[in-house]
Amino acid sequence: MLFTNKKTDIATNRFGGDGDVIINHYIDEKLINDSIVMYAEVVLKPGCNLGYHQHSGNSETIVALSGTAEYNDNGKTMTLKPGDTVHCPDGEWHSIGNAKDATEDLHLQALIAKSN
């Protein structure tokens, strides 16, 4: 099945973060099953971030596609480069953002799956 008309959402100050989060959904919401909450490319312009938040009832896996991410994993900060993958299990906390002085947009692939 080919998906050519992808839905784009823009979330402002998501989870108390700064700026806009552009979410380019890979598949139509109607086709998402009981296991998947979201599968999308997430784009953050310089200075934009998703605020620190907890996953409850689901987990998230993120792959850095391009740019450099500032990632907070339960209070431990790290830098993600293209190809790096992080996972936030159910009940854990995280945030991710693009540095204010970044020279390019941050592109991520995000998969949020419901917990069993």
Question: Residues of each region from the PLM?
Answer:
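A short, N-terminal "cap"/entry segment at the start of jelly-roll beta-barrel domains
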Residues: 1-36
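Conserved hydrophobic/aromatic beta-strand scaffold that supports enzyme active sites
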Residues: 23, 39-43, 61, 85-87, ...
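Conserved short histidine dyad/triad with adjacent acidic residue
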Residues: 25-27, 40-56
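A generic "binding-loop/recognition-motif" signal
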Residues: 46, 57, 76, 92-93
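Short beta-strand His + acidic residue motifs that chelate non-heme Fe in jelly-roll/DSBH
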Residues: 52, 71-72, 88, 94-102
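Glycine- and acidic-residue-biased ligand/ion/polar-headgroup-sensing regions
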Residues: 57-69
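Short acidic-glycine-tyrosine-enriched beta hairpin
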Residues: 75-90
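A short hydrophobic beta-strand segment most commonly corresponding to one strand
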Residues: 87, 102-116
